[in-house]
Amino acid sequence: MAAGMLTDREREAIVSNLTKDVQALREMVRSRESELVKLHREIHKLKSVLQQTTNNLNVTRNEKAKKKLYSLPEQCGEQESRNQNPHLCSSCGMVLPTSPEFALEALSLGPLSPLASTSSASPSGRTSADEVRPKAMPAAIKKQGVSAESCVQSMQQSYSIPIPKYEKDFSDKQQIKDAIMDNDFLKNIDASQVRELVDSMYSKSIAAGEFVIREGEVGAHLYVSAAGEFAVMQQGKVLDKMGAGKAFGELAILYNCTRTASIRVLSEAARVWVLDRRVFQQIMMCTGLQRIENSVNFLRSVPLLMNLSEELLAKIADVLELEFYAAGTYIIRQGTAGDSFFLISQGNVRVTQKLTPTSPEETELRTLSRGDYFGEQALINEDKRTANIIALSPGVECLTLDRDSFKRLIGDLCELKEKDYGDESRKLAMKQAQESCRDEPKEQLQQEFPDLKLTDLEVVSTLGIGGFGRVELVKAHHQDRVDIFALKCLKKRHIVDTKQEEHIFSERHIMLSSRSPFICRLYRTFRDEKYVYMLLEACMGGEIWTMLRDRGSFEDNAAQFIIGCVLQAFEYLHARGIIYRDLKPENLMLDERGYVKIVDFGFAKQIGTSSKTWTFCGTPEYVAPEIILNKGHDRAVDYWALGILIHELLNGTPPFSAPDPMQTYNLILKGIDMIAFPKHISRWAVQLIKRLCRDVPSERLGYQTGGIQDIKKHKWFLGFDWDGLASQLLIPPFVRPIAHPTDVRYFDRFPCDLNEPPDELSGWDADF
């Protein structure tokens, strides 16, 4: 029957059948997507198990842990089960990593029944052991932080230690420069710094068959191939070959890292150019400090700006852009509207003026040179230029600042002409906080639980593991009472080997002196021959990372609450001149009420209000561009990381992520505008993320004149109860029931550490 002959009832039947078919297909797609998600989770679990098993291959089956801390006594009904199964650890009752059950249990949804605890609910009504038993293993791998050696000593000596220079002819310099500009990461370095790097590279000859770098070894040098042929190898297999003029090993000039490939010489008379990491850091630091000092001195010479605080002058110096004008160029034309201010850094300009609008002749008024400025009235309002400014031969370099950038940093200058342009109340609060921290005697920082000894602590369970050590849940028996703490155990030898002593002391001082409900408390510290210990507040609600892993992502209201808690912590820290530098879900914990606390201050540092620091540290997916490029950084990096965290909470993954750290850094340097946001992330959330993750630090929300209040007032937070959060009267979006003080149901399971670290007796921790 022709389509036009169909009755209304027949058409409705056809439409109904088609609708059913579409619904069936949609259901099939949803089912397949669900299966795909499950498969991805199983893959993540398998990766986690393989990684954990690989890390424990060196553990011998018969080796026993020698603990300084005393284990929790066996519970009823467990001893018999452990004696019957040789694959259970005698100390903690967990499956040994060397046993076949370890891999099977980690892949299952829960513990295998033959290995499960047999204890039942106690008469007191506590939850049974099975109900509080932690999950088997993480289904995804946690992000790891990285750090170079502390730059504190280098900053103090940056001008006193000469930077090494090595003679080269023009072709050698050009070869190195071309290799740098051909590298995705190195090409982002400023031209003036590239010249310094080229001058500081030295030549090294390498025989045929020798390795320039070896896979698995820790590196500290950048190389540029100068002559010969080289093989790129992984696990003994040749992946590629390269000739002269290629840069490689660039990750090693940022921080201590393990080489992921080998470079072997194939030809005779091979030669490379070499740059040491310490020299790279010194160059970047010295040039950065010199640039800031010069710019601030320039700005201070301008009467309109002379009353600005050191902090604001440093901020303005950050947004100054270097522009070159060829000889004869009109930088400013008389009578045109202007919105930019200029400082001459190199060269000369001629100032001319037409005496009348109709006059064909320009009268020369004077010549301006290095250190002079013009166009400053444009910072106040739209200025009609009253003269011409013309670049003289051979050209002129100017530092420029536009009115919009200036207003974002300090507000309307018209309202501040007769007073200090700095934020007086904020500066006073920061000064008082810093003096309080600086003047506080060391004895006062360790007053809580002064009579508690390391031997008073009894290990209940492991809450987490990392490269530096473990975090244990412990009971403290003292003064006729029992308290519960988290004990962070850090291997002293590993700290010394990675040159992290300065970071550990900084973490100790900052945490002992911090008093905020949004920051995990550090009560006191201990030390022995093998470890330094931090006795911390136990946050038994578990990690935000674990919740994110299990849920996939958070809804807006939950993400807003988490970010709100982080902002409260940042407001406290930044007011005291402290930057955090390691924000990520792995470092956020829930207390028993469901409030979020920041933990792990290993990368935190007190730098004051107008200073910068140069140490590369953070988590690759979260580091800001200025950290990657060694430009010097301050609290603006925390606002960048806040934007990354919002994206990860709402989407389940950070916006910049790649299998290799250097690939991740290159993605970060391309910028947030290159990221395609998923449709389920709201428009206001996307806008906030983009305003936090600006390449230029001074353009980030939170770093401008309104401070953190600018973030709190953003439309993504519309209707959020900030007063309720600050007073902790706001009901959290997730409250996780905790049966008793040692209920570890919200933590993953971890095997015993059977490798006892060597003694470390250098004495660096004498004041710990």
Curated annotation (Swiss-Prot):
Residues that hold 3',5'-cyclic GMP 1 according to the record: 249-252, 259-260
Region (Disordered): 114-134
SUPFAM superfamilies recorded: cAMP-binding domain-like, Protein kinase-like (PK-like)
Activity regulation, per record: Binding of cGMP results in enzyme activation.
Biological process annotations from GO: larval somatic muscle development; signal transduction
Catalytic residue positions: 582
PTM characteristics: Autophosphorylated.
Protein name: cGMP-dependent protein kinase, isozyme 1
Organism: Drosophila melanogaster (Fruit fly)
Source organism phylogeny: Eukaryota, Metazoa, Ecdysozoa, Arthropoda, Hexapoda
Gene: Pkg21D
